From Swiss-Prot:
This is Holliday junction branch migration complex subunit RuvA. HAMAP family: DNA_HJ_migration_RuvA (MF_00031). InterPro entries: DNA_helicase_Holl-junc_RuvA_I, Hlx-hairpin-Hlx_DNA-bd_motif, NA-bd_OB-fold, RuvA, RuvA_2-like, RuvA_C, RuvA_C_sf. It comes from Orientia tsutsugamushi (strain Boryong) (Rickettsia tsutsugamushi). One of its GO terms (molecular function) is four-way junction helicase activity.
């Protein structure tokens, strides 16, 4: 399960973006608000929280700049009749905070202003999310901490495996640690094999 992606923002369309990670392009669907924020970042390194949906014939990735929007996205889909497309459509018009306020205050007008959101859907949103929206920030913060912990563990494992590989080739631990740390700092998405290969190439120069 992909929870986060970090790579070069290759291109943006009106409904999705493509992130290039080591030559592999990942198509990631996002809300209009997220796409607008990233439109000036093409060619730069970006990081997105990811929600992965696996179907029989395909895998869909949905990306968010912050975990609060990801939580709101999943919360919206818990409402009867709302799928991924409508959830992104709502978040293209309202931020998670605006959505939270609209439902908490039972502000139907704010939701009614969104095209495709009719009275029956508004009723379901008000009823089914009324007791949930207050927890958006808490859930987002807890999930972010878990992802940060996972990222840290992944970083440590990659470096540790690469160091072990270089030591097996007769390179001292101190030298292996130094050269691998330098490379990993420049290429945080690199795999163990690529990290070892790059280290050997750099050492041979």
């Amino acid at each position: 399960m992909i929870a986060k992606l970090k790579g070069i923002l290759d291109s943006i369309t009106d409904s999705y973006l493509i992130i290039d990670i080591n030559g592999v392009g990942y198509q990631v669907y996002s809300s209009g608000k997220t796409l607008m924020k990233l439109i000036k970042e093409e060619g730069s390194i970006v990081s997105l929280f990811i929600e992965t949906h696996v179907r029989e014939d395909r895998i869909h990735l949905f990306g968010f700049l912050d975990n609060t929007e990801k939580v709101a996205f999943n919360m919206l889909q818990s409402v009867s009749g709302i799928g991924t497309k409508m959830a992104l459509h709502i978040l293209s018009n309202l931020t998670p905070h605006q959505l939270q306020i609209a439902i908490s205050s039972q502000n139907r007008h704010q939701l009614k202003a969104i095209s495709g959101v009719g009275p029956k859907l508004i009723d379901r949103l008000m009823i089914e999310l009324r007791d949930k929206v207050a927890n958006i920030n808490t859930i987002a913060n807890n999930t972010s901490l878990a992802i940060l912990s996972t990222d840290s563990n992944t970083h440590d494992n990659i470096l540790s495996d690469a160091i072990t590989a270089l030591i097996a080739l007769g390179i001292s631990r101190a030298e292996a640690t130094q050269i691998l740390s330098d490379i990993y700092a420049l290429f945080p998405s690199i795999s163990v094999n690529e990290l070892v290969r790059t280290a050997l190439q750099r050492r041979a120069k």
